[in-house]
Amino acid sequence: MAETSKTVVVTQIGSPIGRRSDQRATLIGLGLNKMNRTRELEDTPAVRGMIDKIAHLVRVEDV
């Protein structure tokens, strides 16, 4: 049987304008570059770490 991997839905709710360059780069790394863009990502420790870095700029929903 194939295992279903957990996913998280991440939506950008904050603007990267005026933010540090590493926070902007993290948004781009998650595939978010414009307001209200949504991505469904695999729930891995690396992705969770990136989300923690920019928690004030994104909304996260577990799927």
From Swiss-Prot:
Gene Ontology CC annotations of this record: cytosolic large ribosomal subunit
Highest taxon, organism lineage: Bacteria
Keywords: Ribonucleoprotein, Ribosomal protein
InterPro entries: Ribo_uL30_ferredoxin-like_sf (IPR036919), Ribosomal_uL30_bac-type (IPR005996), Ribosomal_uL30_ferredoxin-like (IPR016082)
SUPFAM superfamilies reported for this sequence: Ribosomal protein L30p/L7e
Similarity remark: Belongs to the universal ribosomal protein uL30 family.
Subunit relationships: Part of the 50S ribosomal subunit.
PANTHER family: LARGE RIBOSOMAL SUBUNIT PROTEIN UL30M (PTHR15892:SF2), MITOCHONDRIAL RIBOSOMAL PROTEIN L30 (PTHR15892)
Protein name: Large ribosomal subunit protein uL30
Species, as recorded: Rhodospirillum rubrum (strain ATCC 11170 / ATH 1.1.1 / DSM 467 / LMG 4362 / NCIMB 8255 / S1)
Taxonomic classification: Bacteria, Pseudomonadati, Pseudomonadota, Alphaproteobacteria, Rhodospirillales
